Curated annotation (Swiss-Prot):
One of its GO terms (molecular function) is monosaccharide binding. This is Glucose-6-phosphate isomerase. InterPro entries: G6P_Isomerase, Phosphoglucose_isomerase_CS, SIS_dom_sf, SIS_PGI_1, SIS_PGI_2. The keyword Isomerase applies. Belongs to the GPI family. Pfam families: PGI (PF00342). HAMAP family: G6P_isomerase (MF_00473). It is found in: Cytoplasm. Catalyzes the reversible isomerization of glucose-6-phosphate to fructose-6-phosphate. The lineage of its organism: Bacteria, Bacillati, Cyanobacteriota, Cyanophyceae, Synechococcales. Its EC number is 5.3.1.9.
């Protein structure tokens, strides 16, 4: 295909470029416009061989090759929406059985066949999960739940004491009819464990039983799975080892909230499966995920030199930028390529929603540093319950603001991608998620990195664990009531550092008043500390 180069000063050339590059799929009702990204037909041609190799790798992944070398693990999120792709009959059957189990459980919760121990129907859900275990469900609920449909959802996705306190206290009048869902693949992630412990304590304090209203989503045989089994929790769902957190939205992690808000699981999975079929195509121009990956590649010179700003012009998709932030950055942010060469790859993602952002950072996007490209997301079909008043439709204005922002950026030579969806529902959300999952996989192949491990995340977890261990050692040391300098503590505890000790002590002394600093607070070198005993 030969198309004109990006030329904002020539309307005819730009119209020709737009028309040739516009991708459309009638089945989904989906358009992708990459015409305002700066690449040439020669650039795309130069990627064709690399793209074919990327497709081979993606095909091998779908057939069950080991993709996460660190954990010697398969990556099977594509099987979740088409169980026949799974490499074994046992896995295929397990996927189908799990989907049916989730459907039955959710329907029985909503129709009142499953109730609290007191015979009351469940009214609310408190979802406890971190990272993909929280972001996927949050996206599902925020984007798809209609008014007065299904259960009311709240989330504990952090270990902030103020946030936990505020959320738990918001349940006082409905605590007895709340379903508690705990998500942790390994069962050993500290954040959901801590949030669960606090929630259980809160229930106990209010005279309510935990097990009869608790659900676990975890890997079979994990510590959480064993707890749920031993304590006879209301229900357990499997999260297979071949599903990563950031791609777990089409697993039980996303399907359970779907059914609990009264949405159609099959429609969601069908949308993802349909996009999967489209994005297996070998022709770049007929593969929207390949077009996205190519746009990212040329925009950032294959090095992620430009940020991606995600601007969905729809309130219900406000969480989408956060969801993509994890999917893209955790997958592509890698220090080394697959040959252990230091490459420091990545693609930074941020965003919120239009038209709000037009009154925030779009000023810089148009007139400031040119280090980004925008991904607009547009939904064509407006809410029919909101009428025109004085011949003015909010939907018309929203569309006008999107097109105006796109043009204003383009006039100043700023790049953008526009994704347009005819109608937003569970089917098209599934397709949108699958679009970006495949784009991430293809882009990772183009830059030769492993998209399916997260050594940086693991390093952060290990460092946090070491800090908590150091805090325990400091607390034990200070039990004698003696006065210690920071230097003295460091010399007593091997492998510690002054800075870490100081930061731990500062937090301790502000939350446990038996710890007292002595000295000049503005100079940590002079401080001493002791515990009243």
């Amino acid at each position: 295909m030969n198309f004109p180069d990006f030329n904002n000063n020539n309307k005819d050339d730009q119209w020709e470029r737009f028309s040739q590059l516009l991708f459309y799929d009638e089945e989904i009702g989906f358009w992708l416009d990459i015409s305002r990204m700066k690449f040439s037909s020669e650039d795309i041609g130069s990627l064709q061989d690399n793209f074919k190799e990327a497709c081979k790798s993606m095909k091998a992944l779908e057939k069950g090759s080991i993709a996460n070398i660190d954990e010697s693990r398969q990556v099977g999120h594509y099987w979740l929406r088409n169980a026949s792709l799974a490499p074994s009959k046992q896995t295929s059957n397990s996927i189908r059985n799990e989907i049916n189990d989730i459907k039955t459980f959710g329907e029985n919760i909503l129709n009142g066949k499953i109730t609290t121990a007191q015979g009351k129907p469940f009214t609310d859900v408190l979802w406890i999960g971190i990272g993909g275990s929280g972001l996927g469900p949050l996206l599902i609920v925020n984007s798809l739940q209609d008014n007065n449909k299904g259960l009311n959802f709240s989330f504990l996705d952090n270990v902030d004491p103020n946030g936990i306190n505020k959320t738990l206290n918001s349940f006082r009048d409905k605590l007895s009819t709340t379903l508690f869902v705990v998500v942790s693949k390994s069962g050993g992630t500290p954040e959901p464990q801590i949030a669960m412990d606090q929630t259980r304590f809160f229930l106990d304090k209010n005279g309510l039983d935990w097990s009869s209203r608790a659900v676990a989503i975890t890997m079979e045989g994990s510590s959480l799975d064993q707890i749920a089994e031993n304590e006879k929790w209301l229900k357990r769902f499997d999260l297979p080892d071949w599903v990563g957190g950031r791609t777990s939205i089409t697993a039980s992690v996303g399907l359970l909230p779907l059914v609990l808000i009264g949405e159609d699981i099959d429609s969601f999975l069908d949308g993802a499966s349909q996009m999967d079929q489209i994005t297996r195509r070998i022709d770049i121009y007929k593969n929207p995920s390949a077009l996205l990956a190519a746009s990212w590649y040329f925009s950032g010179a294959g090095k992620g030199k430009r940020d991606m700003v995600v601007l969905p012009y729809q309130d219900r998709l406000q969480v989408f930028s956060k969801y993509l932030q994890q999917l893209v950055m955790e997958s592509l942010g890698k220090e080394e390529d697959r040959n252990a060469n230091k490459v420091n790859q990545g693609l930074a993602v941020y965003g919120n929603k239009g038209s709000t952002d037009q009154h925030a950072y779009v000023q810089q996007l148009r007139d400031g540093i040119d280090n980004f490209f925008v991904t607009f997301v547009e939904i064509l079909e407006d809410c029919t319950e909101i009428p025109k008043i004085n011949k003015k439709s909010p939907g018309d204005y929203l569309s006008g603001f999107l097109q105006g922002t796109r043009l204003a950026l383009s006039e100043n030579d700023r790049q953008s991608i526009t994704i347009t969806i005819k109608k937003f529902n569970s089917y098209t959300l599934g397709s949108l998620i699958a679009l970006f999952e495949r784009a991430v996989g293809i882009y990772a192949e183009l830059i030769d990195i492993n998209a399916y491990h997260q050594p940086g995340v693991e390093a952060g977890k290990k460092a946090a664990s070491n800090i908590l261990k150091l805090q325990s050692e400091i607390e034990l040391l200070l039990e004698d009531g003696k006065l210690y300098s920071i230097e003295g503590i460091m010399n007593t505890i091997p492998g510690s550092s002054q800075e870490s000790i100081y930061i731990i002590l500062r937090h301790l002394s502000n939350n446990d008043h038996t710890y007292k600093f002595v000295g000049n607070l503005s100079d940590p070198r002079e401080l001493q500390i002791k515990k009243a005993v």
